[in-house]
């Protein structure tokens, strides 16, 4: 009798645990947070060598870290966008070290996505001082730590703001605001696709966060600008938030922008042109936001591959320079509901390789595959061997040799393969 009672009790506990687990998994939680990562005025801007590391003169609009956390009870991820030229992997690792214990998000579930604005803060590049001094000014460890700590603050703030949410994902096209900028191939491909993640509050039914994913260099503002700015990205966020209304936070993730520039629009100055590009992008995102239908729950899968790389000298990086013997980084992918895949590229993927990765995602059964550029690192340009051989501008700042582009593409294919939708067998 005692054995039977023990067996029944064990069965009851097992069923209860399964029920509780299923219940926990059926509740989707989300949170948003942001922080100001604008360094002190006088800090050099990062992006244009023509500035010659001169000190910044002011703040036009704050550069920010904006974090979105999604937790389905099984996987908890943070997507944090920073208005910056590009955080390197060491910075990302420190952000994770600060934010992970405070949020209980696994370190490799924190994704730091640099917008690549050329009007963000400098003085942060520790490796390759010759390049660092030209692009971002003299290294200052206190400024670097400032960026890291402020970005972690955004993630921690989002974690304190968790609520029940629903999620919707979709895509549209922002035509005419980007162009192929490289010299090879002639009339190279442009990807106008806009990916959108919308997160709604269950309580209010209104959006609390919109993530837009679009490929273009935030370089509407030229080297003559000496004030901090998010470039067209800031205008896009502001316009989208006004269009939606309420207490919504818009955030931006760049795509495969390695060979893509914004198309110049009419305007009296760079600010008007930035506003024009940002407003057009926001209008397309708004269309998608209004069209997509939210779900109460989303399945989340992740895949990660650590990479050990070796720098290959170029005309910009001659053999006389001192290089680290190896460089550690990573490449990642996320899938939602076996329908939408996001490949997190640790650098500036070229447009040709972008289409190769997206086509492979479609072949593997994903409804849409998106690229999160400059995510968790900023490795420079990632282009095809053909582009490298034609000595394009991008090839001069392609750090890991002519075969690096195909290597990254193949690693992306393998990540997508690991996450590919499983076909349900009919009985």
Per-segment meaning from a language model:
Residues 9-19:
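Bacterial N-terminal signal peptides
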Residues 20-24:
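Sec/Tat signal peptide C-region and signal peptidase I cleavage site
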Residues 281:
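Anionic-ligand-binding alpha/beta catalytic cores of soluble enzymes and soluble regulatory domains
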Residues 25-113, 117-249, 253-276, 289, ...:
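Conserved beta-alpha junction segments in alpha/beta enzyme cores
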Residues 1-4:
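N-terminal secretory signal peptides that target proteins for export/translocation
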């Amino acid at each position: 009798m005692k054995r039977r009672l023990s067996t029944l009790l064990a069965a009851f506990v097992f069923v209860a645990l399964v029920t509780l687990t299923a219940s926990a998994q059926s509740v989707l939680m989300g949170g948003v947070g942001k922080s100001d990562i604008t360094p002190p005025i006088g800090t050099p801007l990062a992006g244009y060598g023509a500035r010659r590391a001169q000190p910044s003169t002011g703040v036009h609009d704050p550069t920010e870290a904006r974090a979105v956390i999604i937790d389905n009870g099984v996987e908890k991820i943070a997507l944090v966008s920073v208005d910056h030229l590009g955080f390197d992997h060491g910075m990302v690792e420190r952000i994770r070290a600060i934010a992970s214990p405070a949020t209980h998000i696994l370190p490799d579930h924190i994704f730091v996505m640099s917008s690549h604005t050329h009007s963000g803060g400098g003085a942060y590049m520790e490796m390759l001082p010759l390049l660092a001094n030209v692009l971002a000014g003299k290294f200052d460890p206190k400024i670097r730590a400032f960026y890291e700590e402020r970005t972690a603050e955004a993630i921690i703030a989002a974690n304190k703001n968790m609520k029940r949410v629903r999620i919707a994902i979709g895509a549209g096209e922002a035509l005419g605001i980007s162009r192929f900028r490289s010299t090879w191939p002639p009339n190279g491909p442009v990807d106008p696709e806009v990916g959108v993640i919308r997160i709604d509050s269950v309580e209010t039914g209104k959006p609390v966060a919109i993530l837009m994913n679009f490929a273009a260099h935030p370089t509407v503002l030229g080297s003559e600008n000496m004030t901090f700015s998010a470039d067209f990205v800031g205008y896009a966020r502001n316009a989208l938030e006004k269009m939606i209304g309420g207490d919504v936070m818009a955030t931006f993730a760049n795509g495969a922008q390695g060979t893509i520039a914004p198309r110049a629009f009419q305007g009296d100055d760079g600010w008007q042109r930035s506003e024009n590009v940002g407003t057009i992008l926001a209008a397309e995102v708004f269309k998608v936001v209004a069209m997509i239908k939210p779900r109460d729950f989303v399945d989340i899968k992740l895949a990660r591959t650590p990479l050990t790389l070796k720098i290959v000298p170029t005309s910009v990086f001659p053999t006389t320079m001192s290089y680290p013997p190896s460089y550690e980084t990573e490449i990642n992918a996320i899938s939602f509901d076996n329908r939408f895949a996001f490949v997190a590229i640790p650098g500036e993927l070229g447009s040709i390789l972008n289409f190769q990765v997206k086509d492979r995602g479609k072949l593997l059964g994903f409804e849409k595959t998106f690229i999160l550029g400059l995510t968790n690192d900023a490795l420079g340009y990632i282009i095809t061997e053909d582009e490298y051989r034609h000595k394009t501008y991008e090839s001069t700042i392609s750090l890991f040799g002519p075969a690096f582009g195909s290597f990254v593409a193949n690693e992306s294919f393998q990540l997508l393969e690991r996450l590919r939708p499983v076909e349900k067998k009919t009985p």
